[in-house]
């Protein structure tokens, strides 16, 4: 949020705490009175911010979508974000799988590569199967009908 000029806020506008109805999305300028950002660095050199909202007042023009109807929109975007995060994780997994395989082919013990050891081969096969399964589920998620909430939830649950 450190570089953002606006933020989207989900707020309960009616109903009780557990109700799916009653959540509304608002857009507010970062410099608005009632919004404070506390920026901090992250381990991977990205920037992050804690957004503190206190007594923020917004006009009706700040409403995004329909009043009290944002729950399903938020759920859909969380699911899409989960697919994106899993896609990144799969890329990391591929790099680790390839690096491990290369290491096992090049590392020698008792005059031969450790990849000749049957136990190592079993583990490499297990790792490859887990990777291929994750990749297949990711492809299924990407090509599924994300506009269908039931199908989207099932697919994202399988992907996690």
Per-segment meaning from a language model:
Residues 1-36:
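A short core secondary-structure module
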Residues 3-5, 45, 118, 155:
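Residue-level preference for beta-strand/loop junctions
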Residues 35-132:
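Glycine-rich beta->alpha junctions and the first turn(s) of the following alpha-helix
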Residues 125-147:
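Active-site pocket-lining segment
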């Amino acid at each position: 949020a450190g570089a953002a000029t606006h933020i989207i806020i989900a707020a309960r506008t009616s109903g009780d705490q557990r109700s799916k109805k009653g959540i509304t999305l608002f857009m507010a300028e970062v410099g608005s009175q009632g919004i404070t950002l506390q920026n901090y660095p992250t381990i991977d050199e990205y920037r992050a911010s804690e957004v503190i909202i206190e007594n923020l007042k917004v006009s009706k023009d700040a409403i995004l979508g329909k009043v009290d109807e944002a729950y399903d929109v938020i759920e859909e975007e969380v699911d899409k974000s989960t697919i994106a995060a899993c896609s990144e994780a799969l890329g990391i997994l591929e790099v680790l799988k390839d690096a491990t395989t290369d290491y096992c082919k090049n590392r020698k013990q008792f005059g031969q590569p450790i990849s000749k050891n049957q136990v190592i081969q079993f583990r490499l096969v297990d790792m490859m199967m887990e990777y291929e399964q994750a990749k297949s589920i990711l492809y299924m998620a990407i090509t599924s009908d994300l506009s269908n909430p039931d199908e989207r939830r099932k697919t994202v649950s399988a992907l996690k």
